[in-house]
Amino acid sequence: MIEVFLFGIVLGLIPITLTGLFVTAYLQYRRGDQLDL
């Protein structure tokens, strides 16, 4: 039962982590793009 609970937590955290990394990379890319201009 605990294993299923941990598995659910991991499955819930993975998309959040990927989204956070994507947003951070996108904001850094936008900032670098503006600096070039």
Curated annotation (Swiss-Prot):
GO biological process: cytochrome complex assembly; photosynthesis
Membrane protein topology class: Single-pass membrane protein
Entry GO CC: chloroplast thylakoid membrane; cytochrome b6f complex
Name recorded for this polypeptide: Cytochrome b6-f complex subunit 5
Organism: Phalaenopsis aphrodite subsp. formosana (Moth orchid)
InterPro entries: Cyt_6/f_cplx_su5, Cyt_6/f_cplx_su5_sf
Subunit structure: The 4 large subunits of the cytochrome b6-f complex are cytochrome b6, subunit IV (17 kDa polypeptide, PetD), cytochrome f and the Rieske protein, while the 4 small subunits are PetG, PetL, PetM and PetN. The complex functions as a dimer.
Subcellular localization, as worded in the UniProt entry: Plastid, Chloroplast thylakoid membrane
Single annotated GO MF: electron transporter, transferring electrons within cytochrome b6/f complex of photosystem II activity
Keywords: Chloroplast, Electron transport, Membrane, Photosynthesis, Plastid, Thylakoid, Transmembrane, Transmembrane helix, Transport
Function: Component of the cytochrome b6-f complex, which mediates electron transfer between photosystem II (PSII) and photosystem I (PSI), cyclic electron flow around PSI, and state transitions. PetG is required for either the stability or assembly of the cytochrome b6-f complex.
TM spans (from-to): 5-25
Family, similarity comment: Belongs to the PetG family.
